[in-house]
Amino acid sequence: MVHWTAEEKATIASVWGKVDIEQDGHDALSRLLVVYPWTQRYFSSFGNLSNVSAVSGNVKVKAHGNKVLSAVGSAIQHLDDVKSHLKGLSKSHAEDLHVDPENFKRLADVLVIVLAAKLGSAFTPQVQAVWEKLNATLVAALSHGYF
């Protein structure tokens, strides 16, 4: 279990309060699919993902980005037990979707980039450190179903 200080929880809540789930989710998932094109194989039902314009204009990418960030938001509401909270999602990604767990880290990394671009100078090294701790917690919880 991860220990969160009151300050860390406040930082996460502050950053999350500035997140536009629909737009930032779309931006993060689009960036993942463009920067790591091999991840597109998990989204074959999304249609054309052949270039940046196709990815960024794809309504299924936008909807799934929203779904992903909604899950992050839900996990944030359960910081003291993220692993249990994400157990079902971990299991489905491992057993049904066969997603390489390294892709959770990649998505977490692109989300940091999206948030840093959005928040600018407010995304301080201290904020990034807390967000990286959150990402590590989320990635570990999502990867748990694989081991």
UniProtKB/Swiss-Prot annotation:
GO cellular component: hemoglobin complex
GO molecular-function term, one example from the UniProt record: oxygen carrier activity
Tissue expression summary: Red blood cells.
Amino acids binding heme b: H64, H93
Domain Globin: 3-147
Xref: InterPro entries: Globin, Globin-like_sf, Globin/Proto, Hemoglobin_b, Hemoglobin_oxygen_transport
PROSITE patterns in the cross-refs: GLOBIN
Keywords of the record: Heme, Iron, Metal-binding, Oxygen transport, Transport
Entry-linked CDD domains: Hb-beta-like
UniProt subunit comment: Heterotetramer of two alpha chains and two beta chains.
Function summary: This is a larval (tadpole) beta-globin.
Family: Belongs to the globin family.
Protein name per Swiss-Prot or TrEMBL: Hemoglobin subunit beta-2
Protein species of origin: Xenopus tropicalis (Western clawed frog)
Lineage: Eukaryota, Metazoa, Chordata, Craniata, Vertebrata
